Every structure is written in structure tokens, then in C-alpha cells.
């Protein structure tokens, strides 16, 4: 998120072996602002500023303790912002801007609409919050919502709100609230009524709920002066375009609009033309060839049959724990229910496990996320709620079990480690029939690792652990696994093969017969009447 001050802890080295480093991309690049009128050729304007050399997943909160290329030479006190904001920045220990902030802040402070291509966790949150707060501080106090920030996930929304509270420390007339799914709508309604805020951070679905169901909310949102779409590409990937268009229709046309996105595909361009004024600025803070991964991350993959995956995972984790006293591991799984199963198995094996996924309540997710952020000696088993836009410092190892949805998902998961100039490890564990995915990351220096020899004690331990896991968890994992791989075109093309692979997964959990699936769910998957699938 935001650049923080240095500390001794930031320079402490890991007590573990260092693997080979991945390939980095050399050569400077100048961030560019492109003035566009929404049609025809674009005229480029070079923005003064240094080349972007930030790590893809680095949080600005972590950047502060790093010397060298991660920070610009520009200090916040060189920026035309109010003494109250500067005081809050100083209190938080922030001195120099990240290079993303250096490239974008001056233009945003001028009131321009901006589409910024910026990697997640590079200080972009401050780049849109600080100028918006400067504008809001000049407005008469009112119950209207003046700054609306839309985020793709609850976790990211909470982080943006936390960053806003830091910057608002001395702006006592301004307040911030979060509205997200997973909390009770009436509770949020009461909170907004009793303590009207000027800054609202929201996920699209819950914001739409309030527009449709909260009395007076549509009037309050007519006071919006600044609209921010954070991680715009992910908002669109998650299917929120229609919701965003409805929300835009509710708020005033005379406003400043800021879109921050790690990638700028055509769909992001389209929404920018809808949301922003003609002549908006496009600022690219990602140097060519540097959209990918960290030079500090040693990337490896293993290929093994599904029935060995639990044993290999346990073996790798035990070795990593033995090698690094300050281990902090994230294990990414394909779905929420598979995440739950893996967490239960590893917990039965007496590892220090926390789990986080979309089936957990928001309060439980927040509690686990906060604990993992502050702790060491923990293993977080996660679905993709932790893949992007969530800041966990000092992650020593990221393991991805099973097929990532795509190259981008692989990269963003990997981006949880190798931060602050420290080394990181990434391991991708695939079944033989998943190896086609490696073609999409062959330019990322992912090397093959030897599958470890699994001794009988590990095999016995895993088998016993699986035996202690409730059958219901295995049934839910099987159904979710089948749904996930059925959505993959390369695998679902041959339904009989998909059924055989699902049976392999079922056997890997210790089930003699694949679980039966409700007929309605099979119909929704398009798998009704497929031979080999049991239904109820």
C-alpha cells in the first residue's frame, strides 16, 4: 500500500538456503502519460520520472524499508499537499514516494482523469487517496459521499480503508466507511446513518445493494467528486461490468475519475471511455517486460500423480520449516472447498495451519488475514482471495497445488513472495495431464524440481490424516474440483477423460467410490447423463 519508514527488521536476512534467481529484465523505461480523446490516434506525453523497477506484488507498506531502486528520490514534502496530510504521512514514517506515486500524483493533483497501468501493491492506493483527500478537505462538510472507491474484493476494500484512515489522521472532519459483502446490510445502513462518511470504499455487489435498498443512499452518492476503480482489470474479470455501469449512472458526470489496473486489456479501455472524460491521461508505470515476476523468486515446478500430491505437499512443507525458522508459507488451491480439505489434512498432520477462502465469513477472513500478516511460523492455505492486492510481508514460500486458471493468476499468486528485495521461493505442483500449462510460463524461468522420495512414515501419516477428515469435506472438495476442471476448456473437452481424472482425485482423498452429486448441480455443470458420474 503505502511507503513506510525503514526498520532494522526490514534488513534481517533469512536463515535458509538461497535458490537460483529468476530472470529479470534490464534497461530503463520512462513512465508515459497518453492524452486520449477516446477516439483516433493517441498523442503521447512523456511524464518526468524514473523507470519503474518495483516488484510485481510488492506492497507500498513494505517498500519503505528498502534501499535502492524501489523508492524514488522525490519526498512527499515536495508535493503540493496540505500540512495536515504531510503531518499524517510523517507520523506513519513515510518520507519518499514510490515510483508509481511519483509518476501519478502530480497529474492526479491537477484534477485530471487518469487511467494508470500500475502493478498491484506498488503504492497506488496512496496515489489516488492522497489527492482525493486534498480535494475533500476544501469542501464544506456535508452528509454526502464525496469519494467513492470500488474494489474487487473485501480484503482489498478493507486495506484501502485502513490506508485512508492513516491519511485522515489530522483531517478530523472527514470519515471513511467500508461496505462489503459478508456483513449484514442493516448493520451497514445503521452505521452510515449514525455516522455519515465522506469516503466510501465498496465492493460492487454490496454498493448496488445499498443503491437499491438503503433509503437516501442514492441521494448521498450524488455528492461524489472523485470515483476510483481500483484493480479495474480484476473488477471486469470478475464480471462486475454491468454493476459498474449502473453505479456510474447514479453519480454525477462532473467528477474526477481514476482507474488503476495491473493490465489494460480492451475491456478496461472500453470502461475507461464510459467512466472518464475525453482527454483523460493514460500513465504507464510498468516498464516493458516487467509485468511479470520478481527477480528474487526462484520458481520451480514438480509433476507427480494426484495420489502423491498430499504426501509431496507435506514433505515440502516439513523441509521448508526445518530450513527456515521464520517460515511463512501460502498454499494456493483451486477452489474454496479444496482449500478447506487441504487445510484440514495439514492440520491433522500437526502443522500450524490457517485457512482463508470465500466460504468463510468476512469476520473470520479478516481475523485470519490480520494474524497471518503479523505472524511468522504459519502456513496459510488459501483460495484466490489472497492472490492479489493483499499485503502479507515476509512470505518465504508460495506453493500452488493444481492448475492455475491462467498465466496471470500464476503470476499474482507468486507475487506474494520475493518482496522487499528478499529471496522467495515458488513451487507449482501439477499432475502429468496439467503440464500443458507450463507452455504459458516458459519465459519465466520456471525450472523442474525433482520429486522427493516419499518415505513410508510420511505416506502413513498422510493416509491417517485423510482418514480423520470428515467424509462431507471430501465430498464437497470432489464436487468443487469437478466444477473447476469442467470449466477448463482444455480438460473438459473430453468428458469421459474428465470423469476419470475426477475419480483419480477422489482416490487421492482415500475414497473408494467417487461421491454422488445432486442432479441439479450436474445439470448446471452440463454433466448430467455423463457416464461414470454418480447422482442423487
UniProtKB/Swiss-Prot annotation:
Molecular-function annotations in GO: ATP binding; ATP hydrolysis activity; RNA binding; RNA helicase activity
Stretches that traverse the bilayer: none
Pfam families hit by this protein: DEAD, Helicase_C
Ranges where the Helicase C-terminal domain occurs: 316-466
Motif position, DEAD box: 230-233
EC number annotated for this UniProt entry: 3.6.4.13
CDD domains the UniProt entry points to: DEADc_MSS116, SF2_C_DEAD
Residue intervals of the Helicase ATP-binding domain: 105-282
Binding site for ATP: 118-125
Reaction catalysed by this enzyme: ATP + H2O = ADP + phosphate + H(+)
Gene3D superfamilies documented for this protein: P-loop containing nucleotide triphosphate hydrolases
Segments of skewed composition (Basic residues): 11-20
Keywords noted in UniProt: ATP-binding, Helicase, Hydrolase, Nucleotide-binding, RNA-binding
Lineage top rank: taxon: Eukaryota
InterPro entries reported for this sequence: DEAD/DEAH_box_helicase_dom, Helicase_ATP-bd, Helicase_C-like, P-loop_NTPase, RNA-helicase_DEAD-box_CS, RNA_helicase_DEAD_Q_motif
RNA-binding keyword on record: yes
UniProt motif (Q motif) ranges: 74-102
SUPFAM superfamilies with a match to the protein in the record: P-loop containing nucleoside triphosphate hydrolases
Annotated stretches, region: Disordered: 1-44
Family recorded in the similarity comment: Belongs to the DEAD box helicase family.
Comment field on protein domains: The Q motif is unique to and characteristic of the DEAD box family of RNA helicases and controls ATP binding and hydrolysis.
Protein's recorded name: DEAD-box ATP-dependent RNA helicase 26
Organism: Oryza sativa subsp. japonica (Rice)
